[in-house]
C-alpha cells in the first residue's frame, strides 16, 4: 500500500505504531499498535468520534495494551522492531481503502481507519458494541459533506467549532456577562446587518470602550428575540484568528483552514454571522511567497453578500491596516464606538455588580461602583472607560476575596509574633546568664498571653467564615435561578417561568436577606468583623493608589497628623525660610483634602535666592516628608539643557531620530510616578526655549511626549530654583533678615528680564529666599551635628558640643553670599576630621561620649568620656 495515499494523521499513526512495536518487542506492526497510535495522535479525530459516542477511550487503550502484551516477543541484538505490517493490519488497511473509495475520497483518513477497525478488529467491536450506527452518524456530521482531497483534511471538519466560538450558545448557557447601555451602537449594527449589500459593520473605537460588548449585546438580543425578523434565526460565531494561524505547518494550510471556515459560513445561507475581533490582523495574515493573505480571501464573499461579518478594531489600527486597503475598507460600514461618560459607566457597573458578587463571593457597595467610575476617570488617564473602572472593581473584589481566604491581618500578626517568641524562647533556654533567664521569664508570660489571644481570634474567624459561606451559597443559588428564569422565558416554558418568578426567586431573596441580617446581628458592623466581605470605596481608592502611586484613599489618622504637622517637619529641615515652607505645605494640604483645581498641578513654585539658603533642600525635605524617601523626587538639572535642541531630552526624541523609543527624561519619570515632586534645579542655566515646554504643564497639568501620549502632571509639585537677583538680595537685606519692597521689586525686574511673562503668569507663587543670618547659622549647626550623631550611632559613639562651641562654629563659617554650604565644610574640618583621627588612632569602646568645647585660644577641645565598666 502506498503511504502517500494516506493523510498526514494516518502516516503519523503508523510511525507511532512502530514505536509501540519496539516498546512491546514486536517484529510486526499489529492492529492494536496502529489503533492505539491513532488514539494518541494530536487532536485525534479517531478518539474524538469515539468520545462523542460515549465510549470509554481510556479503557479501550488499556484493552489494546493488554492485547499487545500477549503477542510473542522477539529479542536479540540486531532485531528491527516494527519492520513488517502484520496480516491483520494489512486487512484493516485494505478495508480502509475500500471505505475511502466508497466515500469518494482521494486519501485514507482517520474515519476510514475507524470504520475498518469496527469491521475487522475484535477488541474494537467489543467496546463499540451496538453503537455502530451512532458512530456512522457522527462521522457524517463531522465530515459535513466534505471529501478528503488533501492530506490534511481534518482542518476542514467542523472548522467553525474548531476556530471559533458560538456567542449565542454561550448566552443561552449563561456564560456571558450582561451588556448594559450601548443601545444606539447595537441599533446601528442591526441596521447595517439588515442591508441587502455591504451589510458588514466594523466597530471602531479606543481599546476598552466596549466594542466586543456590543456584539455580545447583539447575541443577547437574538436570544431574547429582541431583534428584527431577519436576524431572529441568526447565530454569531467569533473567529479565533490565532487558532487559525497556529500550527499551520504546511504551505497553504492556513488558507485551507480559512477556506473551510468561509465554506461553512456560506453553506449556512446567511444564518451565521462571523465576528472577527481585531479584524486588522486579517490584512497580511498568512501571507508568504506567492500566497494570498486572508483579507483578499474575504473580499469576494463580502462583495457578493455571501459572508455576513462584524469586525472590531481600534482607530489607529483601522487607519494603519484597513484604510490602506481601500477595496477591503469599502466593503465594511463603520460604527463609531465612543468612550462612555462617568454616569454611563456607573450604570454599566451596577448591571455587572451581581455577577461579580456571585463570582467573588463578596458584597459590593454602590458607593464603591461610583468611586471606581470617578477615580478611574480622574487618575488612570492612559486607559478608557468602562474597561478601567470594571478592572478596578474586579481587582478590589479579588483583594477582598484573597483576604477572606487567608488569615486576617490581626490574626496573622499574632501568629507571627507567637512564632517569633517561640524561636526566641528556644534560643534563651540554652543561655545560663541572669539577664537571659530574666528575659526568658518575661517572654514566657508574653507568649502565654499571645497564645490565648491567638486561640480566641481563630475561633472568631472560623465562625465568620462559616456564616459567609452560607450567604455565598444562597447568592449563587439565586443567580442560577435567575438564569433558569431567562432560559424558561426564551424557550416559552411559561409554567416553569411563572414558578421561578413568583415562587422560587422571591423565596430565595427572602432567605438571602434573612441570612445577611442574621450575619449582621451576630458579627456586628463591617468595621468590627475579623473578615471583610464588603467592597467599599476605600478598597477602590487603595487599588487606584497601588496602580498610580497617587494617594486617593481616605486619610488614616497617622496621615492626618502627618499632613497637619507637615509645616513643622519642613521647618526642622529648612531653617529661616518660613514663607516658602508655609506656601508649599499649604499646597499639599489643599490637594490631599481634595479641593485643589483638578486640572492643574498641586503647586508650581519658583524659588529665588542666593546659593546655599535651602531652595533645593526644601524640595528634598518635601519629597522625604510625603514619601518617606528623597528618591521620589524627580530632579532635572537644568544646566544640562543649555542648548536649544536639548528640549527633546525632556519629552523624547522626535520620530526618526536616535532615542525615539526611549521616551523623555521628564515624561517617562512622571508616567512611572505620577505623584511626585519635580525639581528643576538652577533654571536660569537652561536655554530659554526649554521653558516653552513647561507652559502646558503649569496651566493644564499635562504634556504630550514625542510619541503623542498625554502625560498627566496634575498630581505633581513643580519646584524651580534660580539664583537670579541673588546679588540684589545680598546687598539690600535688612539686619532682621527681612526683604524690603524695593529689593523685592528689583529682584522681580531681574526675573522679568530673563523669563517670558507667560511662564511667570502660570506659576502659583514666586518665593524669595532671604540670605541666612548668624542666628540661622547656629540652628543649622545643630542640624549638622544631629546628622553626625546619627552616622556615629552605628558605632555606638556620640558627641556633645557646648553652646559656646556651636556659636563659634556658626560665626566663623558665616559667609552670607555662600549660605550654609561653607558651614558644612567648616564642621567637617573642625569636628569630623579630628574625631575620625581619634577613632582610628585608638579603639573607642561602645558608649563613648566625645565632648567638644571652646578653649580660651578660640580653638576646639575634644574630651573622650569612656563608659564605666
Swiss-Prot record:
Residues 85-145 are annotated as: Repeat 2. It is found in: Cytoplasm. It holds the Pfam family AAA. It comes from the Bacteria. Residues 390-524 form a coiled coil. GO terms for molecular function: ATP binding; ATP hydrolysis activity. CDD domains: AAA (cd00009), RecA-like_ClpB_Hsp104-like (cd19499). This is Chaperone protein ClpB. Residues 443-465 are annotated as: Disordered. Homohexamer. The oligomerization is ATP-dependent. Residues 3-145 form the Clp R domain. Belongs to the ClpA/ClpB family. The lineage of its organism: Bacteria, Bacillati, Bacillota, Bacilli, Bacillales.
Amino acid at each position: 500500500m502506498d503511504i502517500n495515499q494516506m493523510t498526514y494523521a494516518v502516516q503519523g499513526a503508523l510511525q507511532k505504531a512502530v514505536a509501540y512495536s519496539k516498546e512491546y518487542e514486536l517484529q510486526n506492526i499489529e492492529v492494536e499498535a496502529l489503533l492505539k497510535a491513532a488514539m494518541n495522535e494530536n487532536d485525534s479525530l479517531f478518539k474524538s468520534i469515539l468520545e462523542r459516542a460515549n465510549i470509554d477511550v481510556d479503557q479501550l487503550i488499556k484493552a489494546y495494551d493488554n492485547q499487545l502484551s500477549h503477542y510473542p516477543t522477539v529479542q536479540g541484538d540486531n532485531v528491527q522492531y516494527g519492520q513488517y505490517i502484520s496480516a491483520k493490519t494489512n486487512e484493516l488497511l485494505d478495508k480502509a481503502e475500500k471505505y475511502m473509495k466508497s466515500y469518494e475520497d482521494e486519501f485514507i483518513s482517520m474515519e476510514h481507519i475507524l470504520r475498518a477497525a469496527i469491521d475487522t478488529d475484535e477488541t474494537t467491536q467489543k467496546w463499540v458494541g451496538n453503537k455502530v450506527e451512532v458512530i456512522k452518524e457522527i462521522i457524517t456530521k463531522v465530515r459535513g459533506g466534505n471529501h478528503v482531497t488533501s492530506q490534511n483534511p481534518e482542518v476542514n471538519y467542523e472548522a467553525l467549532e474548531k476556530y471559533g466560538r458560538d456567542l449565542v450558545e454561550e448566552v443561552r448557557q449563561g456564560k456571558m456577562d450582561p451588556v448594559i447601555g450601548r443601545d444606539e451602537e447595537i441599533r446601528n449594527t442591526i441596521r447595517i446587518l439588515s442591508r441587502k449589500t455591504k451589510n458588514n459593520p466594523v466597530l471602531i473605537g479606543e481599546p476598552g470602550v466596549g466594542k466586543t460588548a456590543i456584539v455580545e449585546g447583539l447575541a443577547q438580543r437574538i436570544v431574547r428575540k429582541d431583534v428584527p425578523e431577519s436576524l431572529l434565526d441568526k447565530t454569531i460565531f467569533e473567529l479565533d484568528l490565532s487558532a487559525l494561524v497556529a500550527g499551520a505547518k504546511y504551505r497553504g494550510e492556513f488558507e485551507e483552514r480559512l477556506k473551510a471556515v468561509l465554506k461553512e459560513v456560506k453553506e449556512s445561507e446567511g444564518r451565521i454571522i462571523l465576528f472577527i475581533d481585531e479584524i486588522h490582523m486579517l490584512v497580511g495574515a498568512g501571507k508568504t511567497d506567492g500566497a494570498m493573505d486572508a483579507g483578499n480571501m474575504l473580499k469576494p464573499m463580502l462583495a457578493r453578500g455571501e459572508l455576513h461579518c462584524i469586525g472590531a478594531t481600534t482607530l489607529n489600527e483601522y487607519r494603519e491596516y484597513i484604510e490602506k486597503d481601500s477595496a477591503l475598507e469599502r466593503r465594511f460600514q463603520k460604527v463609531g464606538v465612543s468612550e462612555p461618560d462617568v454616569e454611563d459607566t456607573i450604570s454599566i457597573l451596577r448591571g455587572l455588580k451581581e455577577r461579580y458578587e456571585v463570582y467573588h463571593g463578596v458584597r459590593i457597595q454602590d458607593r464603591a461602583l461610583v468611586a471606581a467610575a470617578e477615580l478611574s476617570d480622574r487618575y488612570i488617564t492612559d486607559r478608557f472607560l468602562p474597561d478601567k473602572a470594571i478592572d478596578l472593581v474586579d481587582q478590589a473584589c479579588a483583594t477582598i476575596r484573597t483576604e477572606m481566604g487567608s488569615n486576617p491581618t490581626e490574626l496573622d500578626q499574632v501568629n507571627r509574633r507567637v512564632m517569633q517568641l517561640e524561636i526566641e524562647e528556644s534560643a534563651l533556654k540554652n543561655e545560663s546568664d541572669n539577664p537571659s533567664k530574666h528575659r526568658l521569664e518575661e517572654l514566657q508570660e508574653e507568649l502565654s498571653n499571645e497564645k490565648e489571644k491567638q486561640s480566641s481570634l481563630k475561633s472568631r474567624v472560623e465562625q465568620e467564615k462559616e456564616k459567609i459561606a452560607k450567604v455565598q451559597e444562597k447568592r449563587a443559588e439565586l443567580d442560577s435561578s435567575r438564569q433558569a428564569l431567562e432560559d424558561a422565558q426564551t424557550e416559552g416554558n411559561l409554567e416553569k417561568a411563572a414558578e421561578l418568578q413568583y415562587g422560587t426567586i422571591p423565596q430565595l431573596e427572602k432567605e438571602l436577606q434573612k441570612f445577611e441580617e442574621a450575619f449582621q446581628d451576630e458579627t456586628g458592623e463591617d468595621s468590627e468583623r475579623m473578615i471583610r466581605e464588603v467592597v467599599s470605596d476605600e478598597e477602590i481608592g487603595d487599588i487606584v493608589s497601588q496602580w498610580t502611586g497617587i494617594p486617593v484613599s481616605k486619610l488614616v489618622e497617622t496621615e492626618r497628623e502627618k499632613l497637619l504637622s507637615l509645616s513643622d517637619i519642613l521647618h526642622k529641615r529648612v531653617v529661616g525660610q518660613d514663607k516658602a515652607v508655609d506656601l508649599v505645605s499649604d499646597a499639599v494640604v489643599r490637594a490631599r483634602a481634595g479641593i485643589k483645581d483638578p486640572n492643574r498641578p498641586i503647586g508650581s513654585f519658583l524659588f529665588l535666592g542666593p546659593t546655599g539658603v535651602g531652595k533645593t533642600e526644601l524640595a528634598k525635605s518635601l519629597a522625604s516628608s510625603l514619601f518617606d524617601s528623597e528618591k521620589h523626587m524627580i530632579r532635572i538639572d537644568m544646566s544640562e539643557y543649555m542648548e536649544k535642541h536639548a528640549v527633546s531630552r525632556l519629552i523624547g526624541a522626535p520620530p526618526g531620530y536616535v532615542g525615539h523609543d526611549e521616551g523623555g527624561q521628564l515624561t517617562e519619570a512622571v508616567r512611572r510616578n505620577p505623584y511626585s515632586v519635580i525639581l528643576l534645579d538652577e533654571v536660569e542655566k537652561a536655554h530659554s526655549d526649554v521653558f516653552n515646554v513647561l507652559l502646558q504643564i503649569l496651566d493644564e497639568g499635562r504634556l504630550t511626549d514625542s510619541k503623542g501620549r498625554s502625560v498627566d502632571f496634575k498630581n505633581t509639585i513643580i519646584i524651580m530654583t534660580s539664583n537670579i537677583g541673588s546679588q540684589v538680595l545680598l546687598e539690600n537685606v535688612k539686619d532682621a533678615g527681612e526683604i524690603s519692597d524695593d529689593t523685592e521689586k528689583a529682584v522681580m525686574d531681574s526675573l522679568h528680564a530673563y523669563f517670558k511673562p507667560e511662564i511667570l503668569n502660570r506659576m502659583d507663587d514666586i518665593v524669595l529666599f532671604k540670605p541666612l543670618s548668624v542666628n540661622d547659622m547656629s540652628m543649622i549647626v545643630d542640624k549638622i551635628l544631629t546628622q553626625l550623631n546619627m552616622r556615629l550611632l552605628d558605632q555606638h559613639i556620640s558627641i556633645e558640643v557646648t553652646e559656646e562651641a556651636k556659636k563659634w562654629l556658626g560665626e566663623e563659617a558665616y559667609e552670607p553670599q555662600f549660605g550654609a554650604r561653607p558651614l558644612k565644610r567648616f564642621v567637617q574640618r573642625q569636628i569630623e576630621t579630628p574625631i575620625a583621627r581619634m577613632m582610628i588612632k585608638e579603639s573607642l569602646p561602645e558608649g563613648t561620649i566625645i565632648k567638644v568645647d571652646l578653649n580660651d585660644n578660640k580653638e576646639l577641645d575634644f574630651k573622650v568620656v569612656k563608659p564605666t565598666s
